[in-house]
Amino acid sequence: MFSFMNPGKSKPAKKGLKIIIVGCGKVGTTLVEQLSKEGHDIIIIDKNAKKVQEIANIYDIMGIVGNGASYSVQMDAGIEDTDLIISVTESDELNLLCCTVAKQVGDCAAIARVRTPDYSKEAGYLREKLGLAMIINPELEAAREAARILFLPSALEVNSFAHG
């Protein structure tokens, strides 16, 4: 396991949330970009050292190379005082395990990306039993949004209130 930080820069104390993002793919990188702009303290975890170093240098954040579901990796990332963990690796099972480990160790909110339809059907059960704040299926959400917009084709803007 290796940690990367942009050398030679002293970082001012951030006032936002401490957020761990597991997975440095497109979604993880986009989350880092958006959340770091909002002033949150971001730590990334991924097995790909090159990606971790690249993203850590671009956004001046801490990066850890390792398995995000590993207790020791999460401890190195500071899970005990983390506000939120978001797991967006390519593996649904790894995402669920990352969040489960985090919930057992720290008192943080946990969000897992789940793309398999079988798990998406059980999202409510998994969220409740694993104590997750949210389970997201991006493809399903995009399809729902498209259907909602197509249902009201002449609307300029479509907003949901309460639960839809």
Predicted segments — roles?
Residues M1-G164:
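Cytosolic regulatory regions of ion transport systems
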